[in-house]
């Protein structure tokens, strides 16, 4: 008898067998109730008796087919952390849990399919080795970016590094609070300036967070709010003599809608701005265009520190006389790309007197923040992880999607020892393989191509019982596209000959990164106990 006493039902119709059309119908009903892909409540496929199908049970193998890291931590903890106490987990004794990439150093002892290449000699490391003090400040939506990603994948603060995490609002849609926690972030940045930190790295999350919503008015209000707080920070920084770099990690907010009037809710390939302010030499600077990797060498130059050989980025102000060792503020306006100067750009539409004044009075450059410039595939929109990692590393760091794509193209994905072992163990044990993956073809968090590849591997190995647990994106996909994508996937499963889609839920539920474990519990309970909205053939 297996866990929970649930017996898999024998079904004959392909639509029931594969599950995609059934879940798609349930999602359409939830759309009518106002739910969206991003925040979709957990859905569970059930048999004719209302019993959940394909739950994760002891002895099974699980592959978490998402990449990147910070959003996958909470759900992974619930499955593998023996000290987990945020809610009562099942208490697996014999579950093989494979992660696609290393989400956090705490998971280093788990089977990792594509282990990371550590980035050494980052901006933060050089500053720390010089005995200087540094401060990282962000609200929780972007905290991992100014710490883990900016530090090249290092979770631990360096000597002399202080990290400040401000909680983002919870329990309310972000477009209803476009200010987020910006006042508190601003206050901590200004406090750091007054405290005299040698390097301050801060993130204003609003542009990216609001850029992912469909609320045009909130996007415009967001731009105005960021502008006002930008003024406070710049005034404090220049007053204290800080060399100040204002830039972005990627584009998003600058595009409000597509040409056909549909709301634009995803990252862009646009360049991002760089304003470089030196209060000792205002406006006396030749600034060149470049890439995000040029940020770290430029900051080190102002700090009076030598740039390591590993940093291949160039100086953005190569001939500027800094006049000795300076203090530096790097302020990242998340998602604040360079867009058209018309009504499709919330930044243009909003009252932004501070931004307008800075771009008129100070040197201004364009930095490439997408595609190959940040280690992504050519033509791929930028993202916060790649942006911050490349800024901190001072060199192009190949991102997980490129490494995984290379593995898919050269065939090494299909021979990955960790993945092959998971399939073989499920087969030898006569248990099930579970694939938790993102229902997207272009998200920076993952691709449906990975579960499909694993299904082909399982089919070739003779493993028949494979279940898919899908996370709807709502960011890289068009709003309302979930049912169509599920039906397309169902057809692909039919061609492969194995696989059943047994659960689905929104990215905002399954991949929370704000410490809201009530969301994580909803995802976990659906995956393990079958708790969620039941979906059955009609």
Residue ranges and their predicted role:
Residues 1-538:
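Feature captures the catalytic ectodomains and active-site-proximal regions of enzymes
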């Amino acid at each position: 008898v297996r866990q929970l006493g649930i017996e898999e039902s024998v079904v004959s119709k392909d639509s029931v067998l594969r599950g995609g059309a059934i879940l798609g119908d349930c999602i359409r009903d939830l759309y009518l109730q106002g739910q969206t892909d991003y925040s979709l409540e957990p859905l569970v496929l059930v048999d004719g008796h209302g019993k959940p199908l394909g739950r994760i049970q002891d002895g099974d193998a699980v592959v978490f087919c998402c990449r990147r890291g910070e959003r996958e931590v909470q759900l992974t903890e619930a499955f593998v952390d023996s000290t987990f106490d945020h809610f009562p987990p099942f208490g697996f004794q014999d579950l093989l849990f494979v992660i696609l990439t290393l989400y956090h150093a705490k998971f280093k002892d788990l089977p990792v399919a594509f282990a990371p290449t550590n980035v050494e000699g980052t901006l933060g490391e050089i500053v720390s080795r010089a005995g200087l003090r540094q401060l990282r400040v962000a609200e929780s939506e972007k905290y991992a970016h100014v710490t883990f990603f900016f530090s090249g994948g290092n979770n631990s603060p360096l000597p002399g590094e202080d990290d400040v995490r401000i909680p983002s609002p919870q329990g309310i849609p972000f477009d209803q609070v476009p200010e987020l926690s910006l006042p508190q972030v601003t206050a901590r940045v200004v406090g750091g300036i007054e405290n005299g930190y040698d390097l301050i790295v801060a993130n204003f999350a609003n542009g990216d967070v609001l850029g992912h919503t469909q609320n045009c008015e909130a996007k415009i209000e967001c731009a105005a709010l960021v502008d006002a707080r930008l003024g406070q920070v710049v005034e404090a920084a220049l007053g204290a003599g800080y060399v100040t770099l204002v830039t972005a990690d990627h584009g998003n907010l600058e595009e409000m809608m597509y040409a056909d009037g549909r709301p634009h809710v995803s990252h862009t390939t646009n360049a991002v701005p760089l304003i470089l302010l030196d209060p000792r030499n205002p406006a006396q600077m030749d600034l060149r265009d470049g890439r995000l990797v040029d940020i770290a060498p430029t900051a080190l130059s102002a700090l009076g520190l030598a740039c390591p050989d590993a940093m291949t980025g160039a100086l953005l102000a190569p001939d500027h006389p800094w006049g000795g060792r300076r203090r530096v503020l790097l302020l990242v306006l998340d998602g604040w790309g360079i867009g058209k100067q018309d009504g499709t750009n919330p930044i243009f539409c909003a009252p932004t007197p501070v931004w307008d004044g800075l771009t008129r009075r100070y040197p201004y450059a364009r930095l490439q923040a997408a595609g190959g410039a940040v280690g992504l595939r050519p033509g791929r929109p930028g993202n916060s992880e790649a942006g911050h990692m490349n800024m901190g590393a001072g060199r192009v760091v190949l991102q997980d999607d490129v490494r995984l794509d290379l593995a898919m193209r050269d065939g090494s994905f299909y021979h990955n020892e960790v993945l092959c072992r998971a399939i073989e163990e499920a087969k030898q044990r006569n248990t099930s393989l579970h694939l938790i993956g993102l229902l997207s073809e272009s998200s920076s968090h993952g691709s449906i191509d990975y579960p499909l590849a694993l299904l082909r591997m399982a089919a070739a190995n003779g493993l028949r019982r494979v279940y898919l647990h899908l996370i709807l994106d709502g960011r890289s996909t068009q709003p309302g596209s979930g049912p169509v994508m599920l039906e397309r996937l169902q057809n692909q499963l039919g061609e492969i000959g194995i696989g059943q889609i047994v659960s689905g839920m929104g990215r905002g539920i399954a991949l929370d990164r704000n410490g809201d474990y009530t969301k994580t519990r909803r995802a976990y309970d659906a995956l393990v106990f079958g708790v969620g909205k039941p979906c059955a053939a009609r």
